[in-house]
C-alpha cells in the first residue's frame, strides 16, 4: 500500500528524502515517514515419510489447479507460528518439523510469502470450511495438478528445495 495521506492525522503527505531509501511519503504534522506496506503471508509445502506432499483444492482460488497451504501472518505472530497455525487450522495436522525455504514476492497481491517445508507423519487431513478437498500425492506428481510454474508462483521454488533435500533430481 502506498500512502498519500497520514493514517494518524489525515494530512496530505509530502515526499521527503529518507537517507538511502530515497523520497518517502512524510507527514509534517506527525514528523513520521510512511513507507509502503504489504501483507506478510506463509506458504507451506507439507510432506510425509512416504515422500508424498499434501495438495489442496480451494475453489475460490481455482477450479482447475491445486495449491499448498498458505495464509496471512497475524500482527504479533512470527512466520513460523503462522505456518504451524495455518496447517492446523486448514488441515488439522501438527507438523513435526518446519524448515524455512526462503521468501517469495507475490506482486499481484502485494504479498511477501514466507516459504516453508513442513514434515508430518502420514494421516488424513481434517479440512476447514475454506478447503474443498486435500490429499497426499507422490512428490513427483505435484507438477501435474498444481498451478503452473511462473515467476509469481511460490510453490515451485519450495518444491525444488524439497526435491533437493530428499535426494530427487531437480529438473522442474
What kind of feature is each model-predicted range?
Residues 47-89:
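Conserved Nudix-box catalytic region and its N-terminal flanking loop in Nudix hydrolases
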Residues 73-157, 170:
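Unchanged
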Amino acid at each position: 500500500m502506498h500512502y498519500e495521506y497520514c493514517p494518524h492525522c489525515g494530512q496530505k503527505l509530502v515526499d521527503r528524502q529518507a537517507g538511502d531509501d530515497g523520497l518517502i511519503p512524510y507527514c509534517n504534522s506527525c514528523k513520521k515517514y510512511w513507507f509502503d506496506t504489504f501483507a506478510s503471508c506463509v506458504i507451506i509445502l507439507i510432506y510425509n515419510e512416504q515422500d508424498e506432499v499434501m495438495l489442496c483444492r480451494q475453489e475460490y482460488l481455482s477450479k482447475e489447479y491445486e495449491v499448498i497451504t498458505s495464509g496471512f501472518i497475524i500482527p504479533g505472530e512470527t512466520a513460523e507460528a503462522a505456518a504451524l497455525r495455518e496447517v492446523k487450522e486448514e488441515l488439522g495436522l501438527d507438523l513435526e518439523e518446519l524448515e524455512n525455504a526462503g521468501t517469495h514476492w507475490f506482486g499481484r497481491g502485494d504479498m511477501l510469502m514466507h516459504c516453508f517445508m513442513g514434515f508430518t507423519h502420514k494421516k488424513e487431513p481434517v479440512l476447514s470450511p475454506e478447503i474443498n478437498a486435500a490429499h497426499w500425492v507422490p512428490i513427483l506428481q505435484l507438477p501435474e495438478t498444481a498451478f503452473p510454474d511462473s515467476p509469481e508462483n511460490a510453490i515451485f521454488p519450495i518444491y525444488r528445495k524439497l526435491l533437493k533435500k530428499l535426494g530427487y533430481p531437480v529438473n522442474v
